[in-house]
C-alpha cells in the first residue's frame, strides 16, 4: 500500500543513525514501527480514541499519506512529528511507516516537536500552556518569539494561556475533560483549591 503512494526509489533503508551531523534531513525511508518510540517530552498527553480509530481506518485503506519525522536515538528512533499517524499505523497493523529521519540536537528536536504540536488546533489549552512554558523556560524564548514561531499569536495571547497553569488542580482537570472552557476557567486563576 505504501508503494502506491511513495515511490520506493526515494526510500533509503541504509541510514546511519549514529551520525552526529545536526539538522540533517535524510532521504525518505520505511522504518519498522517496533524501532520507533514516542517522545516523552511531546506536549500532547491525551489522544482521542475515536479519532485514532478513524485515522487507523484511513491508513488501512489509503496508507500513510504524510511521513512522520523521527530522530535517531540509542534504541532506534524517537518521534519528532507525527505521533497520531504512528499510533494509527500501529492500530492498522502496519509493520513499517514512511519517515523522514532528522539528526537534531536534543534542544532542536524538542523545539520542533513543541512547535509542530502547537501549530495543530487540537491540543487542549493546558497542553498548549505547558508547551509554551517549555519554549519560554528551556529555550529562553520571549513571548513574542513564541508567538512568531507558532503562527502569529500575540504576546498577550501567549501570556493568557500560560496563566492557566496557575489554576487550581480541579479547574485544570475540568478543562482537560472538556467540562469547562478556557474562558470560563480564567476567573478561577489564583483561587485556592478549597474554593473551587
Tell where the protein language model's regions lie, with residue ranges:
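Short, charged/polar connector segments at secondary-structure boundaries
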Residues: 1-102, 113, 119
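Short hydrophobic/aromatic-rich motifs at helix boundaries and adjacent loops
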Residues: 26-30, 56-60, 101-105, 115-117, ...
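Switch/connector loops and helix/strand junctions flanking conserved nucleotide-binding motifs
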Residues: 107-110
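Amphipathic alpha-helical extensions and coiled-coil-like segments
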Residues: 8, 123, 127-145, 149-196
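Residues at structural and domain junctions
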Residues: 22, 41, 45, 75, ...
Amino acid at each position: 500500500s505504501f508503494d502506491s503512494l511513495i515511490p520506493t526509489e526515494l526510500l533509503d533503508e541504509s541510514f546511519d543513525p549514529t551520525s552526529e551531523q545536526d539538522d540533517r534531513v535524510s532521504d525518505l525511508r520505511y522504518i519498522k514501527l517496533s524501532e520507533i518510540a514516542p517522545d516523552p517530552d511531546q506536549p500532547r498527553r491525551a489522544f482521542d480514541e475515536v479519532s485514532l480509530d478513524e485515522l487507523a481506518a484511513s491508513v488501512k485503506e489509503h496508507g500513510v499519506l504524510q511521513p512522520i519525522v523521527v530522530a535517531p536515538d540509542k534504541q532506534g528512533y524517537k518521534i519528532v512529528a507525527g505521533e497520531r499517524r504512528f499510533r494509527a499505523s500501529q492500530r492498522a497493523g502496519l509493520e513499517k511507516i514512511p519517515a523522514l529521519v532528522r539528526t537534531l540536537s536534543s534542544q532542536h528536536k524538542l523545539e520542533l516537536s513543541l512547535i509542530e504540536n502547537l501549530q495543530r488546533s487540537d491540543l487542549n489549552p493546558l497542553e498548549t500552556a505547558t508547551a509554551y512554558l517549555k519554549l519560554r523556560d528551556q529555550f529562553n524564548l520571549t513571548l513574542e518569539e513564541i508567538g512568531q514561531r507558532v503562527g502569529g499569536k500575540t504576546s498577550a495571547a501567549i501570556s493568557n494561556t500560560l496563566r492557566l497553569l496557575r489554576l487550581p488542580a480541579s479547574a485544570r482537570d475540568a478543562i482537560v475533560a472538556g467540562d469547562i472552557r478556557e474562558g470560563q476557567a480564567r476567573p478561577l486563576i489564583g483561587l485556592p483549591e478549597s474554593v473551587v
